[in-house]
């Protein structure tokens, strides 16, 4: 994990432009309960796992590679008293063994890059949930297409429209049964906390060899968000469901 993310997300309870209420709504859409077993891939600082375990009493296997995030997740899970429900596993998501039909639900929120994009993520996660189970992916999408002249996506931003995003679920054999989209407030809260945290970090680490790089990177991200991305880029959790009948492609 780039050190950049450990700095700018050091105060984020949720590391995506969403809210605690929307994560709990996700749990309702996936019909979670005490008997449910959930896989949370690239789980970061453990925000969604913590909320779902507390709200629904479900078991969660959280997979995260970055020790900086896992350290925080361990502390949060213990403090919340749900360490008997949340299993934290340090592993590269791509290399984590996904047993067929082991889970009732699988999440990948803001981390489809683990499998090189949305289609790869759905292909990896769908077989890991039982028939009738759920796959939820939080993914950016373009609000407008084609993109306006003068705007160039960053490398790796091969996102599509919301309709095309849902279509990829259907192509993976999943029926779209839920959509939880981020509001403008969700986006502004998420992005502007980056700005505050980075400014405080730069003030406290002015002699750090990466300070100039981080300052310039933060300036560029802020300007691009305010000029372009705030209007162009959406983010949503799309929930797909596997067919009930065994043997149907998923």
Question: Model-found features: residue ranges?
Answer:
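Short, glycine-/aromatic-enriched active-site segment of Class I SAM-dependent methyltransferases
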Residues: 137-157
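Conserved alpha-helix/loop element of class I SAM-dependent methyltransferases that forms part
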Residues: 16-34
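A short SAM/SAH-binding and catalytic strip from SAM-dependent methyltransferases
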Residues: 105-117
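A short acidic, Gly/Pro-enriched loop at the edge of an enzyme's catalytic core
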Residues: 95-106
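Short alpha-helix
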Residues: 158-173
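A short glycine-rich, Lys/Arg-flanked "PGG" loop and its adjoining helix->strand segment in the class I
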Residues: 119-134
């Amino acid at each position: 994990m780039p050190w950049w993310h450990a700095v700018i997300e050091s105060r984020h309870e949720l590391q995506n432009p969403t809210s605690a209420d929307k994560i709990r709504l996700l749990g309702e859409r996936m019909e979670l309960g005490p008997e449910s077993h959930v896989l949370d891939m690239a789980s970061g600082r453990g925000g969604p796992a913590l909320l779902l375990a507390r709200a629904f009493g479900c078991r969660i296997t959280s997979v995260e590679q970055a020790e900086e995030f896992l350290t925080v997740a361990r502390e949060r899970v213990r403090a919340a008293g749900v360490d008997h429900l949340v299993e934290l596993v340090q592993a590269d998501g791509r290399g984590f063994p996904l047993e067929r039909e082991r889970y009732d639900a699988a999440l990948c929120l803001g981390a489809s890059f683990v499998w090189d994009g949305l289609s790869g993520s759905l292909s990896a996660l769908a077989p890991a949930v039982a028939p009738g189970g759920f796959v939820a992916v939080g993914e950016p999408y373009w609000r407008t297409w084609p993109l306006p002249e003068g705007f160039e996506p960053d490398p790796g931003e091969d996102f599509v429209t919301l309709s095309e995003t849902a279509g990829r679920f259907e192509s993976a054999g999943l029926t779209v049964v839920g959509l939880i989209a981020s509001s403008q407030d969700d986006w502004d809260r998420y992005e502007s906390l980056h700005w505050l945290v980075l400014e405080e970090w730069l003030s406290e680490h002015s002699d750090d060899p990466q300070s100039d790089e981080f300052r310039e990177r933060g300036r560029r991200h802020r300007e691009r968000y305010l000029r372009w991305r705030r209007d162009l880029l959406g983010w949503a959790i799309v929930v797909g469901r596997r067919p009930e009948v065994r043997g149907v492609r998923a």
